[in-house]
């Protein structure tokens, strides 16, 4: 992704698909594909989902390994003891982490981790000094199950990253596991319309797994009618956590569905569930949005990396 300015920052989110889950030759080869994909992005800050590990010590070691192999850093200074990897443990074995390039400095004691008791997976965030501006970056993985739980946990997420008033400008890279419900103003009519107007489930034959992502009712003949559930996405937008793709009016591009072996791909076809959301002070600083849709990225994971570019000098203060 070419930069629009030498002073801009690139922030990427990447679901790495069960990384480290199996120590087998095929998975070791795929790990290298993930590393090659990350290196090819040449990003400044990276949010990763699906670091697999049975315990915190192993998870931290694996995040350190990924950072080292990708040429990035991942530890935050503490007043006492060793620096701490920017990793939040998820209660179901899927963990989130943050990595950043040399030259970007984490603010001491700024690491925030939320997992068990907060989310189905987890949320990790760190305040980073990106060339004189202090900006909080976060990695999150939303629940794959429970539409109402997803909406409730999104409400909690909004509270954690937007409160109290005066918090640092924040960007959250995530596998949101939901359809975007952000609205944009139609220049012709002045109306607020859905940025993502096409329903990813439209035309798909009903399957039982759609209960996790769809609303449904029945017509007069008793035939089931289904549509994407937008509540969880609307909680984010209405709560002040904005989809960067929508804010930039970026061309729609899916991030999930290219892997024919994944049952989710058959369920929804192509779907845009990975993305970066930002608080209001970041909106005016956004410059570009990009989905890394390459043969390498498609082989490395069932999700495609998403990158946004922002200009620290253009960040607003609330």
Where are the model-predicted features located?
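Conserved beta strand-loop-helix elements of the APE1-like EEP
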Residues: 88-107, 235-240, 263-284, 310-311
């Amino acid at each position: 992704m070419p930069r629009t300015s030498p002073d801009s920052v690139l922030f990427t989110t990447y679901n790495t698909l069960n990384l480290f889950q199996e120590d087998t030759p095929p998975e070791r080869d795929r790990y290298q594909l993930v590393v090659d994909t990350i290196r090819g992005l040449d990003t400044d800050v990276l949010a990763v989902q699906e670091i697999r590990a049975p315990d915190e010590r192993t998870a931290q070691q694996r995040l350190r390994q990924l950072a080292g192999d990708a040429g990035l850093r991942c530890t935050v200074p503490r007043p006492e003891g060793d620096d701490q990897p920017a990793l939040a443990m998820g209660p179901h074995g899927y963990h989130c982490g943050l990595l950043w390039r040399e030259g970007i400095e984490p603010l001491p004691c700024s690491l925030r981790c939320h997992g068990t008791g907060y989310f189905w997976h987890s949320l990790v965030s760190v305040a980073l000094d990106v060339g004189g501006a202090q900006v909080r970056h976060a990695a999150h993985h939303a629940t794959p199950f429970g539409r109402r739980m997803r909406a409730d946990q999104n409400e909690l997420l909004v509270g954690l990253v937007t409160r109290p008033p005066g918090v640092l400008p924040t960007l959250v890279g995530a596998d949101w596991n939901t359809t975007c419900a952000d609205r944009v103003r139609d220049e012709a009519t002045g109306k607020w319309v859905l940025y993502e107007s096409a329903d990813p489930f439209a035309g798909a034959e009903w399957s039982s797994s759609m209960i996790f992502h769809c609303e449904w009712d029945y017509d007069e003949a008793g035939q089931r009618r289904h549509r994407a559930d937008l509540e969880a996405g609307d909680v984010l937008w209405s709560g002040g956590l904005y989809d960067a793709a929508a804010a930039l009016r970026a061309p729609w591009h899916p991030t999930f569905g290219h892997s024919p072996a994944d049952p989710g791909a058959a369920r929804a076809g192509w779907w845009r569930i990975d993305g970066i959301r930002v608080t209001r002070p970041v909106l005016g600083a956004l410059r570009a949005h990009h989905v890394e849709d390459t043969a390498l990225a498609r082989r490395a994971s069932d999700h495609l990396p998403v990158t946004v570019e922002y200009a620290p000098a253009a960040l607003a203060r609330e």
